[in-house]
């Protein structure tokens, strides 16, 4: 089985066959030499048995059939078509001296040896042929197996190539995913930066509104104090009973004007309360998860919200503390008196400041009308 492995061992097989053939021929030659070297007996040779002649004849017939089948003889008419032996075909080999020729034991022995050698060679050739056919068959089987293995290797190589393509595709997908992750991270950073900017803008805006409200409150307190002081300075006691109805009339007129002014002040107070409530509501939701942190366009309440506000139950100090607690976490940076707002926030702030200034101007005008009324009343009394 070792010598039929692949095509590289074919020369070894041929060499082995030739080596066996030469060993076999050498054994036959040594055997014949030993027989020739044996001492000859002086006794007369025994007569040839008919059985020996028949065996030589049968062997010659078998050998001639084999040689003829293998094409060793010529097909020409004047050529021999079989192997002639001196012991059997002496008349054909030496026809001129056939009558005087005597076939000896040596002739028969020689013919027998020739037949044995040819028979052995034919058998060796048959064995070599079978050996060669077997070897070729095994080689063909090995070649088929090699071809099958090659096909299998080719299939495996295709699978490996496909796996490599899949790996490359996965690597490309990973690179794309990394790029998308970086893009989304950049977007997240931008959103966080915008949120911080909006938070800072809102914080500044809230502080500005808070200061503006406090200025308005201080201005209202100042005007109320001024009005109260003027009333105290201008008020004078009257002993005359006749003047009491007129003074009562003046007090009623002044009371009506003050009631009207008080109504305006209550309306303004309700607006301020509504602004504070809206601001408080927005600050509570600002910065919470899944909440709309967009700064509203205005904090001025609607008419329906004003009707629902009861200023008598409004505690300014309480809401001031609440707003202070809500704005305290946002007060991370120092705030100057100069603010920079975006265009829309600046517009809203300007509108609210303008509205507050208009209300303040109306209050001042009302105050002036009150003073004018008091002067008219004073002049009227002097005329009386």
UniProtKB/Swiss-Prot annotation:
InterPro entries: Afadin/alpha-actinin-bd. Residues 224-247 are annotated as: Disordered. Keywords: Autophagy, Coiled coil, Membrane, Protein transport, Transport. It is found in: Preautophagosomal structure membrane. Pfam families: ADIP. It is a peripheral membrane protein. One of its GO terms (cellular component) is phagophore assembly site membrane. Residues 132-236, 342-379 form a coiled coil. Residues 236-247 have a biased composition (Basic and acidic residues). One of its GO terms (biological process) is autophagy. The keyword ATP-binding does not apply. It comes from the Eukaryota. Specifically required for selective degradation of peroxisomes via macropexophagy. Belongs to the ADIP family. This is Autophagy-related protein 25. It comes from Pichia angusta. The gene is ATG25.
